[in-house]
Every structure is written in structure tokens, then in C-alpha cells.
Amino acid sequence: MALQDKGILEALLYTAGDEGLDQQQLLEILEIEPTTLTELIEAYDSPGLTIQHYGNTYVLTTKKEASDYIEQLIEQKSKMKLSQAAMESLSIIAYNQPLSRSDIELIRGINSDGAVKTLIARGLVEAKEEADSRSHQLYTTELFLNVFGIEHLDDLPTTDEEDEEIEAFFSNLVNQKGDNHE
């Protein structure tokens, strides 16, 4: 087992994000046997990261020792405004849910992982695993409804309404602080 294989495994899981990769995908991409994959995972040693096994899926995660620091970072970031990419992704999810990350990228025409991770970290969007799909589907949360002061998704402005009203509706989120969870 080469050091290069460990790096490739880490890069693959990092790229896959919180959806991870299942064992079969890893075996095919790395062109290795199951025992070699097990050895690679057991030998993986990073000061801040670990490989978690959930069912048949492997995910690169942070180690528990870093959780307090990560919480501080998330708290600081949640007080910051949403980026334009996050706003676009949020509106796409709100109007078209459920969607996968790849659906959002197809609509936006650009990688949206960072924006989606921000929305999930702020509690505005959640990823749910669908029984008939290997990918997670993205949905808005109750917090999303609360932030916008609506009770149901049906209360979102429709595209039949003025574009300014829709723009104003979503620009409210830019001014929201992440700690308004009431």
C-alpha cells in the first residue's frame, strides 16, 4: 500500500464532502481489493481528520478533539452575511426542493459545495438521504421559514410577482444574523 494511495483516498473523500463515497465506488476508483481499502482506512492518520464509516459509506470528518474550536468558528461565521453564491443556492433550493448538490450546480453552472455547506451550517438547509437514491436531497428547514417570517413554502413569492419583491424577500437574509433562531 503506497503513501500515494492514502493521499488519493483522502482527496476523494474530501471532494465527495458530507455525502461521502460508498465502498464499491472507492474500490473501483482506487482499483484495489476490499482488504487493501480496509488497511488504507485503518492506517489513515491525520492530526485533525478521520475517516468515518456509516453503513456502506465512508466520509472524511474532523476529529472530536477539534469540536470546540470548530463550534467557535461556525458561531463566528454564522454572524456573517451570506455570499451571493449562498443566496442563489438558497433560492434555488427553496423554489425547487428537493434537489441534490449536482442539481444546484447544473442550474447555477458552477460548483456550489461551499455555498451549500454554509447553508447547512447555518441551519437554513438540511440534507436528507433518500431511500431510492445514493445522493442526499436538500430541503429548506423550519429555521428558513422563521427567518423569512413565513409559515409554508407556498408563502414564497412566485415568479408571477414582481422581480423586485422576490429580490427584496431574499435580500432580507443577507441582513440576518445566524443567531436569530427564535
From Swiss-Prot:
InterPro entries with a match to the protein in the record: ScpB_csome_segregation, WH-like_DNA-bd_sf, WH_DNA-bd_sf
Domain of life: Bacteria
Plastid recorded as keyword: no
Subcellular location: Cytoplasm
Record's keyword terms, sorted: Cell cycle, Cell division, Chromosome partition, Cytoplasm
UniProt feature coiled coil, ranges: none
GO BP: any one term: chromosome separation
One GO CC annotation: cytoplasm
Alphabetized Pfam families for the sequence: SMC_ScpB (PF04079)
HAMAP family reported for this sequence: ScpB
Family per record: Belongs to the ScpB family.
Oligomeric and partner information: Homodimer. Homodimerization may be required to stabilize the binding of ScpA to the Smc head domains. Component of a cohesin-like complex composed of ScpA, ScpB and the Smc homodimer, in which ScpA and ScpB bind to the head domain of Smc. The presence of the three proteins is required for the association of the complex with DNA.
Known function: Participates in chromosomal partition during cell division. May act via the formation of a condensin-like complex containing Smc and ScpA that pull DNA away from mid-cell into both cell halves.
Protein's name in the database: Segregation and condensation protein B
Organism: Staphylococcus saprophyticus subsp. saprophyticus (strain ATCC 15305 / DSM 20229 / NCIMB 8711 / NCTC 7292 / S-41)
